[in-house]
Regions:
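Beta/alpha (TIM)-barrel catalytic core signal, keyed to glycine-rich beta->alpha loops juxtaposed to Asp/Glu
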Residues: 1-160
Length: 161
């Protein structure tokens, strides 16, 4: 084929796996790898709060309208700031119950899918480089990933082993 990889931002993350619907199967069937950007979904997967951003848009009461105007993507009717914050906080609570961090889970999750060849992580210091390497290398137990799937916190089609 004419493509060997694509860069995908924010659509195959611990929070949002919408690329499983169409893009991932196309890539898999055509031996196209994905390089993922935005694995922290604009920061919500570091520290979910009403001050967080998702899809480069602040998660306040105007999130839906502001995202629509930004042309990053058109949100679906069920989406709202509350929807995404609740989901992120539910995943964060699951992380805490397994004595881990949301950031560590967000770094490890994409690599279970064999279509993903690499992830681009935003960092601004050498300490963050070291932390991210450590977060990747300290593997979370399969029971954690199964818990996320069993509780519908990640798409059932997500690869977790």
């Amino acid at each position: 084929g004419c493509f060997d990889c694509f860069l995908l931002a924010g659509r195959y993350t611990l929070l949002d796996q919408t690329s499983l619907e169409k893009l991932m199967p196309i890539c898999e069937n055509n031996n196209i790898s994905l390089i993922l950007g935005g694995v922290f979904n604009s920061g919500i997967l570091i520290n979910p709060s009403p001050e967080s951003y998702f899809d480069y848009t602040k998660l306040d009461s105007n999130w839906f309208e502001n995202l629509t105007k930004s042309l990053v993507r058109i949100p679906k009717d069920h989406e709202s700031a509350e929807f995404w914050l609740n989901k992120a906080n539910s995943i964060k609570n699951a992380c805490e119950s397994f004595d881990t961090t949301l950031k560590k889970a967000a770094i490890q999750f994409p690599y279970f899918n064999r279509t993903v060849s690499s992830c681009i992580l935003g960092m601004n210091s050498s300490n963050q480089v070291i932390e991210n390497i450590d977060d990747y290398n300290r593997k979370l137990p399969s029971s954690f990933w199964q818990h996320l799937k069993d509780n519908k916190l990640i798409d059932e089609r997500s690869k977790i082993i």
